[in-house]
Design a protein with these regions (language model features):
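Extreme N-terminal leader/targeting segments of oxidoreductases
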Residues: 1-81
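An anion/pyrophosphate-binding glycine-rich loop and adjacent beta-alpha core
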Residues: 1-7, 291, 297-359
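Conserved redox-cofactor binding core of oxidoreductases
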Residues: 36, 45-54, 171-252, 257, ...
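N-terminal Rossmann-like FAD-binding beta1-loop-alpha1 element of flavoenzymes
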Residues: 81-107
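Short hydrophobic core segments
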Residues: 83-85, 255-266, 292
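Residue-level detector of alpha-helix initiation sites
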Residues: 88-90, 112, 203, 268
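Glycine-rich FAD pyrophosphate-binding loop
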Residues: 99-125, 131
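Glycine-rich active-site loop/strand segments that organize a redox cofactor
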Residues: 127-158
C-alpha cells in the first residue's frame, strides 16, 4: 500500500477535484452519512421531545432517572448571579463576560478547568478577517454547508461577532499565526470559498484555552472543579434557579442558587454514537442535554450530528485520534486502496465523511 500511495503521488499533485453539486451532495449524504441510518434512531419515550427521533445512545441518556433523592435538602451552599456549568472554551468565555458586566459568577466543571474538547482542537477557527473576505461571504458559505437548515439569527451573530472575538482573544494574549508582514495568517478550511482559518500552529485550541484559563484564574472567578452538575433546580414559576452539583472528591452534594444558569457542557462524542470512535475528551457525555431536558427544555436538531472525516483507524490504540482538517488544508490527500483521490478534501465535512464511508 505504501508503494501504491508513493507511486501515485506526483500524478495526484496535478489533480484538481471539483466539489460536488448540490444534487450530488444530497444523493451521497443520504446514502452514506450516519445521520441517515434509520436503524440507529428511535423515538424519545417521553418529555418535551416525545416521539421525535434521535440516536439510541442519546435517547437513553435523556430518559435516564435523576440521580438525587426527592428529599435532598436544598438549602444553598452558594448564592450567585450567574452559574456557568462547563469549563471549556464556551464556559470560560461566558464566565469572563458575565464577570466583566459585574455579575457574581460561579464556574463549575466536572473535571478540571479547561478539560474539554476546546483544548484538543487543532485545525483552527473560521473568522472573516482577511481583506478579501467578509461576514456576508462567511454567512453564505456556512448556510450552504448547512444545507440551508441553519438558524439564521444564530449564524448572523456568529459571523458578525467573529472578528471582534478574534480581536478580544488577541488582546488577552492568544498568539495566532502571522505572515511575514505581521498580519494574521489565514488558511483554507473545508466548505469555505475564502481563506479564513485562524490558527496557532497545530495546537489552536490549546493556545486559546491556555489564555482563557489564565484569565479566569487572574480575574479570581469562583471555581469548583470536579463538581459535576446532576440536576437543575426550578422556582415556583418553573424557571431555572440553580443546580445541584456532585462533589466528586468527597461524594457530597452542593446546592447552588443562581439568577441565571449557563449550560456550556459540550457535546456527546463519548457516547460513541453508532459505535464510532471519537476524539472527544472523556467528559463529553451529553450531561447538559439531559439536565436541560429534565427541567423541561425542548431540544432542537436531535437528528443531526457531526462526524469528523479524518481520524486514526490503525493501529488499534490510535483509533479515534484526531487527524486535523489542517492537514488537508495544507494539501494532504485522501486516497483509496488504489492510491486514487476520491473527494475534494476541502469539501464540507458531511461530504468528506460520507465519501470515506463509501470507499
Amino acid at each position: 500500500l505504501h508503494e501504491v500511495v508513493h507511486s501515485s503521488r506526483d500524478a495526484r499533485r496535478k489533480q484538481t477535484l471539483p466539489k460536488l453539486s448540490s444534487a450530488e451532495r444530497d444523493t451521497l449524504i443520504k446514502k452514506f452519512h450516519p445521520d441517515h441510518r434509520e436503524a440507529a434512531y428511535r423515538p424519545v419515550a417521553f418529555g418535551p421531545n416525545e416521539g421525535e427521533l434521535t440516536v439510541r445512545e442519546l435517547a437513553s441518556v435523556l430518559e435516564g432517572d435523576s440521580p438525587i433523592v426527592e428529599d435532598l435538602p436544598l438549602d444553598p451552599d452558594y448564592i450567585v448571579d450567574v452559574l456557568v456549568i462547563g469549563g471549556g472554551g464556551a464556559g470560560c468565555v461566558a464566565a469572563l463576560h458575565a464577570h466583566t458586566e459585574g455579575a457574581k459568577v460561579l464556574l463549575a466543571t466536572k473535571l478540571r478547568l479547561a478539560d474539554s474538547n476546546s483544548v484538543m482542537a487543532q485545525g483552527g477557527m473560521q473568522i472573516a478577517v482577511a481583506p478579501n473576505d467578509s461576514p456576508v461571504q462567511h454567512f453564505l458559505d456556512t448556510l450552504k454547508g448547512g444545507h440551508m437548515k441553519n438558524d439564521h439569527d444564530l449564524l448572523k451573530t456568529m459571523v458578525e461577532e467573529g472578528p471582534s472575538i478574534a480581536k478580544w482573544l488577541i488582546e488577552l494574549g492568544v498568539l495566532f499565526d502571522r505572515d511575514p508582514g505581521g498580519n494574521l495568517h489565514v488558511k483554507k478550511g473545508g466548505g469555505s470559498t475564502k481563506e479564513r482559518l485562524l490558527t496557532c500552529s497545530d495546537y489552536t485550541g490549546l493556545e486559546i484555552m491556555r489564555v482563557l484559563k489564565d484569565e479566569v484564574l487572574n480575574q479570581k472567578i469562583q471555581l469548583l472543579e470536579f463538581a459535576a452538575a446532576v440536576e437543575l433546580l426550578s422556582d415556583e414559576r418553573g424557571a431555572c434557579a440553580g443546580a445541584v452539583l456532585r462533589d466528586l472528591d468527597n461524594k457530597r452534594y452542593v446546592v447552588v442558587a443562581a439568577k441565571a444558569v449557563i449550560l456550556a457542557t459540550g457535546g456527546i462524542g463519548r457516547l460513541h454514537i453508532q459505535g464510532f470512535p471519537t476524539s472527544n475528551h472523556y467528559g463529553a457525555t451529553g450531561d447538559g442535554l439531559a439536565l436541560a431536558y429534565r427541567i423541561g427544555a425542548r431540544l432542537t436538531q436531535m437528528d443531526t450530528f457531526q462526524y469528523h472525516p479524518s481520524g486514526g483507524a490503525y493501529p488499534e490504540q490510535l483509533a479515534g485520534q484526531l487527524v486535523t482538517e489542517g492537514i488537508r488544508s495544507e494539501g494532504g490527500h485522501l486516497v483509496n486502496v488504489n492510491g486514487q483521490r476520491f473527494v475534494n478534501e476541502l469539501d464540507t465535512r458531511d461530504v468528506v465523511a460520507s465519501s470515506i464511508i463509501r470507499e
